[in-house]
């Protein structure tokens, strides 16, 4: 995200950081102490509070569960889905228990992946396959899509 913003000469904004700042807690603490429903509302409110067109915005993956948030993002600009195959996602996710991943009780990562995939595709204006990309390659593809 930040590398793409630099290529595009745009600002960069991370909604996870906004949520943490508003709540005064790390994402995982919010989920553990206040629950998934509370976190979902906080995430939706954070996204709906944004009025920053012309900015590269990185969201958490669970924002896709909020139609209102996704439509708001689409009104501000292009929604670009950075696609990873399931196996690649598993390799890249570190510290699952502490990184603030919204995972419903009883769900596996594969359940989450299968549930979110059609939602990501529904809201995406563009899809970039990132499995074999470096950060720089992905940023260049984001920049091409965003222009």
Tell what function each PLM region has.
Residues 1-10:
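A conserved segment at the C-terminal end of the G1
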Residues 2, 68-71, 91-95, 140-141:
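Short amphipathic alpha-helical segments
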Residues 7, 91, 117-147:
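NTP-dependent small-molecule kinase module
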Residues 15-63, 67-71:
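ATP-dependent small-molecule kinase phosphotransfer cores
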Residues 33-34, 53-54, 75-76, 96, ...:
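Structured helix-beta-strand junction loops
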Residues 55, 79-80, 126-128:
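Short, well-ordered beta-strand core segments
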Residues 61-63, 85-87, 133:
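Short glycine-rich anion-binding loops that position phosphate/pyrophosphate groups of nucleotides
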Residues 76-118:
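A glycine- and Lys/Arg-enriched "phosphate-lid" helix/loop adjacent to the NTP-binding pocket
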């Amino acid at each position: 995200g930040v590398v793409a913003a630099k290529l595009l000469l745009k600002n960069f904004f991370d909604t996870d950081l906004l949520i943490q700042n508003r709540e005064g807690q790390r994402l995982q603490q919010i989920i553990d102490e206040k629950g998934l429903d509370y976190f979902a509302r906080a995430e939706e409110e954070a996204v709906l509070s944004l009025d920053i067109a012309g900015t590269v915005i990185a969201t958490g993956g669970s924002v896709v569960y909020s139609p209102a948030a996704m439509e708001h993002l689409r009104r501000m600009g292009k929604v670009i889905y950075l696609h990873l195959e399931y196996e690649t996602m598993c390799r890249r996710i570190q510290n699952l228990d502490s990184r603030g991943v919204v995972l419903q009780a009883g769900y596996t990562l594969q359940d989450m992946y299968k549930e979110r995939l059609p939602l990501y595709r529904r809201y995406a204006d563009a899809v970039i396959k990132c499995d074999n990309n470096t950060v720089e390659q992905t940023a260049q593809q984001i920049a091409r899509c965003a222009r």
